[in-house]
Amino acid sequence: MADLLSSLKNLSHSSGVYQYFDKNRQLLYIGKAKNLKKRIKSYFSIHNNEITPNHRASLRIQMMVKQIAFLETILVENEQDALILENSLIKQLKPKYNILLRDDKTYPYIYMDFSTDFPIPLITRKILKQPGVKYFGPFTSGAKDILDSLYELLPLVQKKNCIKDKKACMFYQIERCKAPCENKITKEEYSKIAKECLEMIENRDKLIKELELKMERLSNNLRFEEALIYRDRIAKIQKIAPFTCMDLAKLYDLDIFAFYGASNKAVLVKMFMRGGKIISSAFEKIHSLNGFDTDEAMKQAIINHYQSHLPLMPEQILLSACSNEALKELQEFISHQYSKKIALSIPKKGDKLALIEIAMKNAQEIFSQEKTSDEDLILEEVRSLFNLECVPYRVEIFDTSHHSNSQCVGGMVVYENNAFQKNSYRRYHLKGSNEYDQMSELLTRRALDFAKEPPPNLWVIDGGRAQLNIALEILKSSGSFVEVIAISKEKRDSKAYRSKGGAKDIIHTPSDTFKLLPSDKRLQWVQKLRDESHRYAINFHRSTKLKNMKQIALLKEKGIGEASVKKLLDYFGSFEAIEKASEQEKNAVLKKRI
């Protein structure tokens, strides 16, 4: 405690970020302050050099303060910089007592550029700095389905560069385009098509009605497979916003955030209203062993959503709850980020309060559906057995694959909300000369990406204690808190025993080794994760090997033998790099003309 007491006596009055650590140097909490000295001292009571938690703090904070042994600070220019740095560090380092919201993606917008002669609908996530652009959104899902439908229902210019080609393409022949490239339609005639496109984007009901008519026509013509495609697309578009029936007399443009939590679970709901109608919505489920802080949740939600410059900002942002201090901070953040005043408020009455109540009702409904399943019970048992600090709600599983140390690849699969999250899977080409170097490269590359993609609760490694130790060293150097276990086959005579029916799995933790019965559900849970990562890595290896064999065959056709191919690969690193290299560069490597 002497180190902590000394740190508390020498605090700066500057703006900055503070980090609390326990006696083992495990990161407990990250916060930010306009005045570091004033903010940090508010956590503690100091009497006769004895440090105790401030009795006015919440029980969650008091419990955390009892564990603090060290603190570190990072000074910045102003409070806005501190707010952004705090959010970035929380995502990267995942402290024990901070809430981590993973959904920080920028939602897509549909736009049309009416400064062009023949405008078409396209998707963007950025602001396009040109006049005449009209945006629609954001869309939390279904933007591509809307776009595909528009191009199939209307004879729009089908590609951005079509006009430059000056020659009608296949789309004209199948009556999906009017061929303005050959002047077969005037700008005035096309503007009517663009106007109808605009109406379908703004009026989802009209779009769905047209899709239903097309589906019926296909069905009547016995084209059932195509009709099924339209049926599925209609269902997706109808799901984009379950609140589209809600229509306010006032043409509000609002973003609405509602947070509801209890015990160790919470839900954040986001709704987006444009022109008085809810056009899309999204929600995120959050888990925490140490309770929730509404201010912290709202701050993360707002910063995650608005830190990238969005094409279409609302007139006002509505929050379900937030302290005055946090509201002021967020207001300053938005004003600074967008150089204009966009009000943040907590409605107390009227139709805006009704919108918050609807968002809260949906958050509570989603929360109530989160019943404890058998899988949740297994997660608790896994935590207890392997002495994990956190329930492994989100898990990343790693495996490598190679053939005689060639075509070395790695795969990462992700398990969350009791299901494999295939959109989060990642594949890696590796350079290591052995399985340990390959695993080290795979895990290092993942750890370097923590700032963009926050770390999980748990890593599962396909390997033994050596691979486990590699993972622990990498995580230690990253500064992020992620727990690790590894699973390997039982070895006999220093070899993995894999004969049918005899392969026993061993689970390694930093402090123990477990040999569980094949019927143990905790072992089966880890095996399920390992098997999926193994399948994913093997499939990637096979596809890489097949692709390489085809590329080797193509080079052989050019008179380049296997030895020369190996030289080129060793030098350039990939077939793609070989193809991009000039003749002079390849000649220099091979010392002969190719």
UniProtKB/Swiss-Prot annotation:
Its main location: cytoplasm. Residues 205-240 form the UVR domain. InterPro entries: GIY-YIG_endonuc, GIY-YIG_endonuc_sf, GIY-YIG_UvrC_Cho, RuvA_2-like, UVR_dom, UVR_dom_sf, UvrABC_protein_C, UvrC. GO terms for cellular component: cytoplasm; excinuclease repair complex. GO terms for biological process: nucleotide-excision repair; SOS response. GO terms for molecular function: DNA binding; excinuclease ABC activity. Residues 13-99 form the GIY-YIG domain. It comes from the Bacteria. Keywords: Cytoplasm, DNA damage, DNA excision, DNA repair, Excision nuclease, SOS response. Signal peptide: none annotated. It is found in: Cytoplasm. It holds the Pfam family UVR. Interacts with UvrB in an incision complex. The UvrABC repair system catalyzes the recognition and processing of DNA lesions. UvrC both incises the 5' and 3' sides of the lesion. The N-terminal half is responsible for the 3' incision and the C-terminal half is responsible for the 5' incision. Belongs to the UvrC family. This is UvrABC system protein C.
